[in-house]
Regions:
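Alpha/beta enzyme core
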Residues: 3-37, 41, 47-180
Length: 180
C-alpha cells in the first residue's frame, strides 16, 4: 500500500474524437462521457465546436479543437481563420499542427509567424503546438520546441497520432527546456 495520496486523473484528461466520420450523436456521446467521468475537456474537429459548446453549456468541461489537422500543411492565414471561427463558436483550447514542410525547409520565421498568428487569434485561450516528432531527429525537435516558445505557445505536443511512430520518442529532446 502506498503512502502517497491518490490523485484523481480525470481532471487531467482530454477526451477526443477527431474521426472524419464523427456524427452529432458521436459528439454528444463524447460530451456525455466527459461529464459523467468529470474529464477536463473534449477535443473535437472544428465543425463540431459549436455543437459541443451547446451540449456542454452548463457543464464544467472545456472544449478543445485542432487547427491545420492532421497535416499542418494549410497556410497560416487558413490556420488563423480556423482559430477565429473556433473562438467564435466557444472553444477553450487550440491544438495546432505546425507546418512540417516549412520547418524542414528551415523557414523558421514562417513557423514563428504562423504560431503567433494562432496565439493572437486564440485571444486568451491556451494554444498547444503539435510538432509531429516522428518526422524529426532530437536536434530538430529541440528547435521546433524553441520556436513554439518564441512564438508564445503554451504547450508542445508530440504527435497527431497520424505521423510515423506516433508520439513515441526518447525524452532527451525535452531536456533543454528543463523537463524531466
Amino acid at each position: 500500500m502506498s503512502d502517497t495520496p491518490e490523485t484523481p486523473l480525470s481532471p487531467y484528461i482530454d477526451h477526443t474524437n477527431l474521426r472524419p466520420d464523427a456524427t452529432a450523436a458521436d459528439i454528444e456521446k463524447l460530451c456525455a462521457e466527459a461529464i459523467e467521468h468529470e474529464l477536463f475537456a473534449v477535443c473535437v474537429n472544428g465543425s463540431w465546436v459549436q455543437h459541443a459548446a451547446t451540449y456542454l453549456e452548463d457543464a464544467d468541461v472545456s472544449i478543445a479543437t485542432v487547427i491545420g489537422f492532421p497535416l499542418g500543411a494549410s497556410d497560416s492565414d487558413s490556420k488563423r481563420y480556423e482559430t477565429e471561427a473556433a473562438v467564435d463558436n466557444g472553444v477553450h483550447e487550440i491544438d495546432m499542427v505546425m507546418n512540417l514542410g516549412r520547418f524542414i525547409d528551415g523557414d523558421h520565421k514562417y513557423i514563428v509567424r504562423e504560431i503567433r498568428d494562432v496565439v493572437e487569434a486564440a485571444e486568451d485561450r491556451r494554444v498547444k503546438v503539435i510538432i509531429e516528432t516522428g518526422y524529426f531527429n532530437d536536434e530538430q525537435i529541440a528547435t521546433a520546441c524553441q520556436l513554439a516558445v518564441t512564438a508564445e505557445a503554451h504547450f508542445v505536443k508530440t504527435s497527431t497520432g497520424f505521423g510515423p511512430g506516433g508520439g513515441i520518442r526518447r525524452p532527451a529532446h525535452f531536456k533543454p527546456f528543463g523537463l524531466p
